[in-house]
Amino acid sequence: MHSPNKFTSGPKQFLESEAITSYADAAVVVVPIPYEATTSYRKGCEHGPEAVLEASDQLEAYDEELGTSPCHDLGIYTCAPLADSNKHPALAGDAMVTEVCDGIAPFVEDGKFVVAIGGEHAITTGVVRAMQRGTSEPFTVVQIDAHGDMRDKFEGSCHNHACVMRRVLELGLPTLPIAIRAICQEEADLIREKNIPVFWAREMADNPNWINEAIASITTQKVFLTIDMDGFDPGFMPGVGTPEPGGLGWYEGLNFFRRLFQTKQVIGCDLMELAPVRGSVVSEFSTAKLAYKLMGYWGESQRKKL
């Protein structure tokens, strides 16, 4: 394990009202990444991590579904923010990806379960690179998203939030996009060319078996989960950059995530693109609760190995 003195804890800890855990004793590391440079509609996702950490203090430590208190059972450590565009507004995309990768890789190497909170979706390229550095086995990137995010470039940048899954594909990793409901022609052509197994939101709405089909389509045992919060129904998740109609419902999403953790080895996850809405806390609270549910599902999967 890397020396705990190597890492700096953040000014705000996830669920710090319930438990603050040292790096050495924590199984889960929360990584705030308040980076925003390329959002193309509603702005504000650089404020997402801080809002989620603040909202986490309102969560109940006890999870009634799991019958445990994950923050006590696992230990959660929140590191200092990476790639903070609030402090460094000129931080370029390639430099951001490098900083995120170099910052997260030691956590992966130490066997921590990383939960990264953004920030714009372009961040995921750096998170996935860190996962590759920390594991020698192949893994699939499961993508919850309203959009394909598979453009080669957008607005002159290859590290635009609309290009992140194209960069992931270039890393040689299989992907599974879920809840997709908006793509461009370039992305449609790529999906056909690469035979990418997309689960379209309009088809999922009429298919009660989509969870089984989605999990059956994953060809690797290891999985990284990337969640753009606009993958959810904006009726309860309005605080996103582009709130596409439709998307995952709350319990539909939880059912999928729990099954995913039960059947696959989830090596890490991120939650991206939360942009808080002034005068409302529903989006950041729901995101904080989702992050905590994912930690709990991971903990459940670890107990079943014993």
From Swiss-Prot:
Alphabetized InterPro entries for the sequence: Agmatinase-rel, Ureohydrolase, Ureohydrolase_dom_sf, Ureohydrolase_Mn_BS
Similarity section: Belongs to the arginase family.
Reactions catalysed, as given in the entry: N(1)-(3-aminopropyl)agmatine + H2O = urea + spermidine
Cofactor(s) required for function per UniProt: Mn(2+)
Signal peptide: none
Name by which UniProt lists this protein: N(1)-aminopropylagmatine ureohydrolase
Lineage: Bacteria, Bacillati, Cyanobacteriota, Cyanophyceae, Synechococcales
Effect of residue 60 to A/Q: Loss of activity
Phenotype for residue 187 to A: Retains 50% of activity
Gene Ontology process terms (BP): putrescine biosynthetic process from arginine, via agmatine; spermidine biosynthetic process
GO molecular function: agmatinase activity; aminopropylagmatine ureohydrolase activity; metal ion binding
One of the Pfam families matching this protein, by short name: Arginase
Binding residues for Mn(2+) 1: 121, 145, 149, 228
Amino acids binding Mn(2+) 2: 145, 147, 228, 230
Protein function: Ureohydrolase involved in the biosynthesis of spermidine via the carboxyaminopropylagmatine (CAPA) pathway. Catalyzes the conversion of aminopropylagmatine (APA) to spermidine and urea. Is highly specific to APA and incapable of releasing measurable urea from CAPA, agmatine, arginine, guanidine, guanidinobutyrate and guanidinopropionate.
EC number annotated for this UniProt entry: 3.5.3.24
